[in-house]
Regions:
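Short, acidic/polar
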Residues: 34-44, 97-110, 215
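Divalent metal-dependent hydrolysis catalytic cores, especially in the metallo-beta-lactamase
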Residues: 27, 31-64, 86-94, 116-117, ...
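Active-site gating/metal-coordination segments in enzymes
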Residues: 66-149, 155-156, 204-206
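Catalytic pocket-lining loop regions of alpha/beta-barrel enzymes
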Residues: 116-117, 131-229
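Active-site environment of divalent metal-dependent phosphoester hydrolases
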Residues: 17-20, 59-62, 95-98, 125, ...
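Mid-to-C-terminal alpha-helical segments outside catalytic/metal-binding sites
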Residues: 1-17, 21-51, 224-227, 241-277
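A cross-domain feature marking catalytic cores of carbohydrate-active enzymes
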Residues: 14-16, 56-57, 91-95, 119-122, ...
Length: 277
């Protein structure tokens, strides 16, 4: 049996707020108080998390005190620089800007700030994944081999991040590298025929609550170790407190029947391949 507590891992989906945002909200007592770069760094050795990928939220009010996309990207860059080689970060989207301006901001994020991909959160932007606004972003990412992470935790078939919207998008951009966050939640079966990677952030404890361990193991087997990516969504979770997230993940994953080689693919191999690290 693989022991996920001691297995080296890259957490491919965490949330960290800039120091300036924490300083501007000193009385915050919600989960975002845990989204602290320095506190997270101190946790990494204990959890055997070798590296982590910071995901923005398509919400400039959370990721800067200037509320601009350029400020968000600068903050993400500074987080990467604070602990070199330990953190990666994906570019944000601010749909107050035109698609052309968004692509320009992504170019700057990659070229000047060395960010590592693009994050789209259709529920936060209010723009459906397959809407025309996103065309220029996907086209740029496909042409420049930039990975895209898509939030997909839909509660209906017409949700902005619904699985069938992802299927449509993948058909339109056949060479795009895509990671589906939260595995498309309870629409995961519609994503089985696709080539998209799946990060297991947030959703894994939900699956166990709904399906039980054995069926959760079966659905992960259907998706395949070559597509699954270890991720937590720390510090956010619908049912767990921040302090409970990693322990819950390790307990669940320890009950899966992945081989050592498969576990290593999920824990760090697939994301390192995507990020070329």
């Amino acid at each position: 049996m693989v022991d996920w507590r001691i297995l080296k891992k890259v957490d491919a989906h965490i949330h960290i707020l800039p120091d300036a945002v924490h300083e501007a909200n000193p009385d915050s007592d919600d989960v975002w108080a845990y989204a602290d770069l320095h506190k997270y760094y101190q946790m990494m050795d204990v959890l055997n998390i070798d590296r982590a990928v910071i995901m923005p939220l398509n919400d400039p009010w959370l990721m800067s005190v200037e509320y601009t996309i350029s400020a968000v990207h600068k903050n993400l860059y500074e987080m990467k620089q604070r602990y070199p080689g330990k953190f990666y970060a994906f570019a944000d989207i601010d749909t107050r800007n035109s698609p052309a301006v968004s692509v320009e901001a992504i170019c700057q994020a990659i070229d000047e700030y060395s960010l590592d991909g693009i994050k789209l959160h259709p529920n936060n932007t209010g723009i459906a994944l397959d809407a025309e606004y996103n065309h220029a972003i996907f086209l740029f990412a496909q042409e420049h081999n930039v990975p895209v992470v898509i939030h997909s935790y839909p509660n209906s078939t017409d949700d902005p991040g619904a699985a069938m919207r992802i299927v449509t998008m993948l058909e339109r951009y056949p060479k795009l590298t895509v990671i589906i966050s939260h595995m498309g939640a309870y629409q995961w079966e519609e994503l089985l025929p696709t080539r998209a990677y799946m990060d297991i952030s947030a959703i894994l404890p939900d699956y166990v609550r709904t399906y039980g361990i054995n069926k959760t193991n079966e659905l992960m087997r259907k998706l395949g170790a070559d597509r699954l990516i270890f991720a937590s969504d720390y510090p956010d979770n619908r049912f767990l407190q921040p302090e409970e997230i990693y322990g819950s993940y390790f307990d669940i994953l320890n009950q899966m029947d992945f081989t050592q080689t498969e576990a290593e693919m999920i824990a760090y191999g697939n994301i390192k391949k995507i990020l070329s690290i």
